[in-house]
Design a protein with these regions (language model features):
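Active-site mouth loops of central-metabolism enzymes
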Residues: 1-17, 66-76, 186-197
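Hydrophobic faces of well-ordered beta-strands that scaffold small-molecule active sites
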Residues: 2-8, 31-33, 61-67, 91-95, ...
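Active-site-proximal loop/turn and secondary-structure-junction residues that shape catalytic pockets
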Residues: 8-12, 35-39, 67-71, 97-101, ...
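Short, acidic/polar
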Residues: 11-24, 74-84, 124-128, 199-206
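Glycine-rich, proline-tolerant flexible connector loops at the mouths of alpha/beta enzymes
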Residues: 29-52
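N-terminal active-site wall of soluble small-molecule enzyme domains
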Residues: 46-91, 100-103
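Catalytic alpha/beta core domains of metabolic enzymes, predominantly
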Residues: 118-245
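C-terminal functional modules
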Residues: 244-291
Length: 291
């Protein structure tokens, strides 16, 4: 499943609605938002999240909101009496650290709950089990990291996700956007530090290989080209390549990698059959070994 983010620090506009519709048409099925706000903005935030939830219902999109204990208090919400939360139209909550796990376990019988994947421990799992949490409503979601050099290490992430998957959790992580980046740093919002600067599709493909069940765009938007590339990959497994100075015969075509995969190049199944790029004989030269 792929999703995207819509933040509530600014008013929701017709452009926001149009972007959501374009993403839904491209195959995205979930929206993430954040309810971490100053207390004096609580009324405005409540109005905006209700509006966002209404748009999500119209577009058949799930809506998960990140919230802390401070955010709950500012909005006048309590996990013990979740009627006000459900009234907004939220699909579920992504729970920040510091919120009582017994209350989380109880909430899981009412709505989906995403736990903090990066900090979840075996003791936390034991507490949730002791409080009879509904495991069909529990998932494990990682953070994004706005500041360069602070994102997660790939090896650590792979190990943590393997553990979470073994426990039965669906995991989620963020990939960077390539459109409007979220401020104030505007340095992209990936989960893995190695993905900072990558295209959304490249990061998505990498996360899919690391036990990641849900993948969301962290930044405000992605470009129409990225939307189309992700839609093609999710629908057919096709990877869209953008190249410059390529022969016209190569562009706009569907190509397949050979089953005997080469280490350093892509060898096309169609290469011999089509003979699109005949090459004149040249003196043989040794290829330097690349480790």
């Amino acid at each position: 499943m792929v999703g995207f983010s819509v933040y509530l620090s600014a008013p929701l506009t017709a452009a926001t609605r149009a972007y959501m519709q374009a993403m839904q048409a491209a195959g995205f099925s979930g929206v993430f938002t954040s309810l971490h706000i100053p207390e004096d903005d609580a009324d405005v935030l409540a109005q905006r999240v209700t509006q966002l939830a209404a748009w999500c219902r119209e577009l058949h999109l799930e809506l998960i909101a990140d919230i802390s204990d401070r955010g709950l208090a500012a909005l006048g919400w309590t996990l013990a009496a979740p009627q006000a939360i459900l009234a907004t139209g939220l699909t579920g909550l992504r729970i920040d650290d510091g919120i009582d796990l017994a209350a989380v376990a109880k909430l899981s019988h009412v709505m989906p709950v995403a736990l903090n994947a990066s900090t979840l421990t075996s003791d936390d799992v034991a507490t949730l089990r002791a409080n009879e949490a509904d495991w069909s409503h529990l998932e494990a979601w990682h953070n994004y990291y706005p500041r360069p050099e602070t994102g997660l290490a790939r090896d650590w992430y792979a190990e943590k996700n393997a553990w979470l998957t073994k426990l039965g959790f669906t995991t989620m992580a963020f990939v960077p956007g390539d459109g409007e980046l979220r401020g104030p740093l505007q340095q992209q919002l990936p989960t893995l530090e190695s993905h900072r600067g990558w295209s959304p599709l490249a990061a998505l493909v990498d996360l899919a290989q690391l036990h990641t069940g849900r993948i969301y765009i962290g930044d405000n938007t992605i470009t129409p080209a990225a939307q189309a590339a992700i839609a093609a990959y999710c629908a057919t497994g096709t990877i869209t390549l953008h190249v410059t100075a390529a022969p016209a015969a190569l562009t706009g075509e569907l190509w397949h990698n050979r089953p005997d995969v080469a280490a350093q190049v892509v060898r096309l199944v169609e290469g011999r059959k089509r003979q699109l790029l005949p090459t004149a004989p040249q003196p043989a030269q040794a290829r330097p070994w690349v480790r």
